[in-house]
């Protein structure tokens, strides 16, 4: 009878933790503050933004650093035309890159590309916390663009080359 009680306690604890995490995620989603509902494979897409925002410095200042920090995400400018998003647990790396200007597309129009460069998986499947972190980072980028340019346009294209970091435990 003893092992059954231990198993029941472990299962009950797992269910309680799962419900608490789901409740926290639902509150974040309903508030719209941290992340948005997206397709399950959104992290395999390249997100391109067409905007009048002229440089990454303005965008970096418009990012919601508080929400990113609460989710353990840091943003660094590692190059003049690139921001790197990483989480504290090394579950993903994403970049926002300013693309070269193309005068044929119009004066004052800039393009930026958000891509996930690496994501941690477990048994070949992306871990939920990595997907959540990527979603939070992408939502912060979208909100920053819309804050600076209400007419910013986003497009998504599936990528064929993205890397995972496999974990067995």
Regions found by a protein language model. Give the residues of each.
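Feature marks short, highly hydrophobic, charge-poor N-terminal signal-anchor/signal peptide-like helices
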Residues: 1-10
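Generic low-complexity segments that are intrinsically disordered, proline-rich and/or Lys/Arg-biased
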Residues: 4, 40, 55, 101-104
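Terminal, regulation- and interaction-focused segments at domain boundaries
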Residues: 14-71
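A generic structural signal for short, non-catalytic loop/turn and secondary-structure boundary residues
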Residues: 42, 78, 105-107
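Residues that act as N-cap/strand-start positions at coil-to-secondary-structure junctions
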Residues: 43-45, 79, 90
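Extracytoplasmic/periplasmic/luminal assembly and interaction segments
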Residues: 61-88
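Cytosol-/stroma-facing membrane-proximal "stalk/adaptor" domains immediately downstream
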Residues: 83-169
